[in-house]
């Protein structure tokens, strides 16, 4: 299969080899590596953890890729964080595809995973396949993610048999928040066995990784030991193979009450707020633009 855009030598080279060259200087920088799904499994086997963040546009994607984030998720959380909806339910395929396209065009190394939004895959494996094909063809996504456990195994199997890598999502599934009674931890007590069974079912159906959201840490640890595919936690403790957060939460662009599982690494809201105030003050005071900004 041929991509719709020209690929760089770094992208077409085998993982870790970089572009062909006659001779590499001893102090040459390490070659750029394109992360593939099997590399995440290899990292799990080595006991090496990996990071995943959401991304919805060019500059965040480029920055996170430069930082070495292995996986970027074009999440249905764009519904809240881009389109200002209260939940993830309203966002559509047609809204997410341009975001996924922008992210995939902007990275050189990260694996780009696109969420399948609510209502675009639940009806049948055939519906799931047709939706996923759009993300792969129109957005150049590298993989897709869908929510659900054992009941979604036919969809996962259909996609993987059709050549589309699938990341599963179990535990608390935001698209089912009304059915689950709101934002609640999943897998406590007797329900723990079901979380393990769902992860095993996703692996058997062909998923290359599984996200666990709002699952007790000991249950997530048991899942991680029970499957050979990587586990990715969001509110699922330290023993997962990788972690994922919504970037606006992690870096303080969104304000207000944060979920317990969020650690904020920056206060981007404060930085942008002050910068905007400084800009407005300069304009009102007549000090911008100055001579150095004028032709």
From Swiss-Prot:
Cofactor: Mg(2+)
Active site: 213
CDD domains assigned to the protein according to its UniProt record, in alphabetical order: KPHMT-like
Annotated compartments: Cytoplasm
Pfam family, any one: Pantoate_transf
EC numbers on record: 2.1.2.11
Residues holding Mg(2+): 76, 115, 147
Enzyme class at the top of the EC tree: transferase
Alphabetic keyword roster: Cytoplasm, Magnesium, Metal-binding, Pantothenate biosynthesis, Transferase
Keyword Magnesium: yes
Reaction(s) catalysed (UniProt annotation): 3-methyl-2-oxobutanoate + (6R)-5,10-methylene-5,6,7,8-tetrahydrofolate + H2O = 2-dehydropantoate + (6S)-5,6,7,8-tetrahydrofolate
Chain residue ranges for the region called Disordered: 1-30
GO cellular component: cytoplasm
GO BP: any one term: pantothenate biosynthetic process
Pathway(s) it belongs to: Cofactor biosynthesis; (R)-pantothenate biosynthesis; (R)-pantoate from 3-methyl-2-oxobutanoate: step 1/2
Residues that span the membrane, as ranges: none
Subunit structure: Homodecamer; pentamer of dimers.
Free-text function comment from the UniProt entry: Catalyzes the reversible reaction in which hydroxymethyl group from 5,10-methylenetetrahydrofolate is transferred onto alpha-ketoisovalerate to form ketopantoate.
Family: Belongs to the PanB family.
Protein name per Swiss-Prot or TrEMBL: 3-methyl-2-oxobutanoate hydroxymethyltransferase
Natural source organism: Nocardioides sp. (strain ATCC BAA-499 / JS614)
Gene name as annotated: panB
